[in-house]
């Protein structure tokens, strides 16, 4: 039997045009999506990563930032183990909306969810409107992980997803979180369902 495969749901949220789809495309294909269009509702991609010797399949949901899709997006908070809350470092308004997005996460997602605040477009230094220091401060005040990224150059993108996933897996290993509440599932790499740690019942994958 191969190593267990952890199935972890991850969502990307944030205002329109902050680069959510470009971050996902960079992480999945290691390319910059120069002709990116606005996400209609929700888009989906997945990738298997190695975290501390464990195979983890990230099921990543890229959500629309427009208000008219809000009712569609909110259902995807449930069962998410990780949330990337993205703002544009060159757009103060997108940063100011962070508190609204955080309010949605706290009211709709599991209390065990891991949130990483992501300042995208960090390569545009001359157009920057939000400093690293002020964003790191708000992350610390709200108990969030924090990184700056550039989907264009790839800087920080891989590490952003891996950092959040490592935190999730550390919580799982330590027994801090309820796997069922987070929607985390475990199967063998052959597709056979295995038991959750400390659980006598099987999970359905």
Swiss-Prot record:
<dbReference type="GO" id="GO:0015031">
    <property type="term" value="P:protein transport"/>
</dbReference>
<dbReference type="Pfam" id="PF00071">
    <property type="entry name" value="Ras"/>
</dbReference>
<dbReference type="GO" id="GO:0030100">
    <property type="term" value="P:regulation of endocytosis"/>
</dbReference>
<dbReference type="GO" id="GO:0032482">
    <property type="term" value="P:Rab protein signal transduction"/>
</dbReference>
<feature type="binding site">
    <location>
        <begin position="62"/>
        <end position="66"/>
    </location>
    <ligand>
        <name>GTP</name>
    </ligand>
</feature>
<keyword id="KW-0472">Membrane</keyword>
<feature type="modified residue" description="Cysteine methyl ester">
    <location>
        <position position="205"/>
    </location>
</feature>
<dbReference type="InterPro" id="IPR005225">
    <property type="entry name" value="Small_GTP-bd"/>
</dbReference>
<dbReference type="GO" id="GO:0005525">
    <property type="term" value="F:GTP binding"/>
</dbReference>
<feature type="binding site">
    <location>
        <begin position="150"/>
        <end position="152"/>
    </location>
    <ligand>
        <name>GTP</name>
    </ligand>
</feature>
<dbReference type="InterPro" id="IPR050209">
    <property type="entry name" value="Rab_GTPases_membrane_traffic"/>
</dbReference>
<keyword id="KW-0653">Protein transport</keyword>
<keyword id="KW-0449">Lipoprotein</keyword>
<comment type="similarity">
    <text>Belongs to the small GTPase superfamily. Rab family.</text>
</comment>
<dbReference type="GO" id="GO:0016192">
    <property type="term" value="P:vesicle-mediated transport"/>
</dbReference>
<dbReference type="InterPro" id="IPR041819">
    <property type="entry name" value="Rab4"/>
</dbReference>
<dbReference type="GO" id="GO:0055037">
    <property type="term" value="C:recycling endosome"/>
</dbReference>
<comment type="function">
    <text>Protein transport. Probably involved in vesicular traffic.</text>
</comment>
<keyword id="KW-0342">GTP-binding</keyword>
<keyword id="KW-0488">Methylation</keyword>
<dbReference type="InterPro" id="IPR027417">
    <property type="entry name" value="P-loop_NTPase"/>
</dbReference>
<dbReference type="GO" id="GO:0003924">
    <property type="term" value="F:GTPase activity"/>
</dbReference>
<keyword id="KW-0636">Prenylation</keyword>
<feature type="short sequence motif" description="Effector region">
    <location>
        <begin position="36"/>
        <end position="44"/>
    </location>
</feature>
<keyword id="KW-0547">Nucleotide-binding</keyword>
<protein>
    <recommendedName>
        <fullName>Ras-related protein Rab-4</fullName>
    </recommendedName>
</protein>
<dbReference type="GO" id="GO:0140220">
    <property type="term" value="C:pathogen-containing vacuole"/>
</dbReference>
<keyword id="KW-1003">Cell membrane</keyword>
<feature type="binding site">
    <location>
        <begin position="14"/>
        <end position="22"/>
    </location>
    <ligand>
        <name>GTP</name>
    </ligand>
</feature>
<dbReference type="InterPro" id="IPR001806">
    <property type="entry name" value="Small_GTPase"/>
</dbReference>
<keyword id="KW-0813">Transport</keyword>
<feature type="lipid moiety-binding region" description="S-geranylgeranyl cysteine">
    <location>
        <position position="203"/>
    </location>
</feature>
<dbReference type="GO" id="GO:0005886">
    <property type="term" value="C:plasma membrane"/>
</dbReference>
<feature type="binding site">
    <location>
        <begin position="120"/>
        <end position="123"/>
    </location>
    <ligand>
        <name>GTP</name>
    </ligand>
</feature>
<feature type="lipid moiety-binding region" description="S-geranylgeranyl cysteine">
    <location>
        <position position="205"/>
    </location>
</feature>
């Amino acid at each position: 039997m191969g190593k267990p495969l952890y199935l972890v749901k991850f969502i990307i949220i944030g205002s329109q045009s902050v680069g959510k789809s470009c971050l996902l495309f960079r992480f999945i294909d290691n390319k910059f999506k120069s002709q990116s269009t606005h996400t209609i509702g929700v888009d989906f991609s997945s990738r298997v990563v190695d975290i501390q010797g464990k195979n983890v399949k990230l099921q990543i949901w890229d959500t629309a930032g427009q208000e008219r899709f809000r009712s569609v997006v909110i259902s995807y908070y449930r069962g998410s183990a990780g949330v990337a809350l993205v703002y544009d470092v060159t757009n103060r308004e997108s940063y100011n909306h962070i508190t609204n997005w955080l309010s949605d996460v706290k009211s709709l997602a599991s209390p065990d969810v891991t949130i990483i605040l992501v300042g995208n477009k960090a390569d545009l230094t001359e157009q920057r409107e939000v400093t690293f220091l002020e964003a790191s401060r708000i992350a610390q005040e709200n108990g969030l992980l924090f990184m700056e990224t550039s989907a264009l150059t790839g800087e920080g993108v891989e590490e952003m997803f891996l950092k959040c996933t490592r935190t999730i897996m550390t919580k799982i290993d330590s027994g801090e979180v309820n796997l069922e509440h987070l929607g985390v599932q475990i199967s063998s790499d052959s597709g056979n369902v295995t038991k959750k740690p400390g659980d006598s019942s099987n999970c359905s994958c």
